[in-house]
């Protein structure tokens, strides 16, 4: 957990509360067991999947498990929610006091948003405001644009990370938790065309 606290700026109490752990896991990318951060994917408090990530950014999820947004229980019945491109960005927002946050299950790699179909009615249709806190790279922008299209331009806002930051965690590391929260709360409406 040293990596998450020291190199990613996520407080240990947040990691504990969110049930983030570290353990050895076999990763096909390296062909051996690696020390991995484990992100539990829960729905109604029940484990549905687990994502494993090593320090070299190799990822693995449980084979055959359902893809669901990470931290999906946190947004049910809320007026507003935040969507990030990854769990570490979501943890950064949680550390800044923004609890109603989910991460897409598979990053921006590919525009596979099939998981969204199952959750639109139960978790997103009731939202007055959806804040999209995606990465600023090409894939992040494509993901953001597709989420806006699917969730509605009239209720989506977009976070701008500014010069030198591509995502929420980089912003946290460059500045601090209060500034991260302020930046996210200044998300801009999307102009209607």
What is the role of each PLM region?
Residues 104-110, 136, 161-164:
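Short, acidic/turn-prone active-site loops that include or flank metal/cofactor-
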Residues 25-126, 144:
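Phosphate-handling DNA/RNA-contact segment within nucleic-acid enzymes
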Residues 2, 6-35, 83, 166-193:
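Short, small/acidic-rich helices and loops at N termini and domain boundaries
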Residues 100-103, 131, 157-158:
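Short hydrophobic alpha-helical runs that function as membrane-insertion/retention elements
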């Amino acid at each position: 957990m040293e990596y998450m606290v020291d190199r990613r700026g996520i407080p240990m109490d947040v990691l504990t509360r969110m049930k983030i752990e570290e353990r050895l896991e076999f990763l096909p990318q390296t062909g051996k067991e690696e020390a991995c951060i484990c992100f539990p994917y829960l729905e109604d408090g029940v484990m549905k999947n687990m994502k494993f990530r090593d320090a070299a950014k190799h990822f693995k999820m449980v084979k055959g498990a359902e893809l669901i947004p990470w931290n999906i229980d946190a947004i049910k019945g809320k007026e507003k929610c935040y969507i990030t491109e990854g769990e570490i960005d979501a943890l950064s927002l949680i550390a800044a006091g923004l609890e109603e946050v989910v991460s897409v299950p598979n990053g921006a790699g590919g525009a596979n948003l099939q998981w969204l179909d199952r959750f639109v009615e139960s978790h997103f249709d009731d939202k007055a405001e959806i804040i999209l806190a995606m990465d600023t790279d090409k894939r992040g922008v494509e993901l953001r644009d597709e989420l806006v299209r699917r969730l509605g331009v009239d209720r989506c806002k977009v976070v701008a990370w500014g010069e030198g930051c591509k995502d929420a965690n980089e912003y946290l590391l460059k500045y601090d938790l209060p500034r991260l929260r302020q930046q996210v709360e200044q998300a801009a409406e999307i102009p209607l065309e």
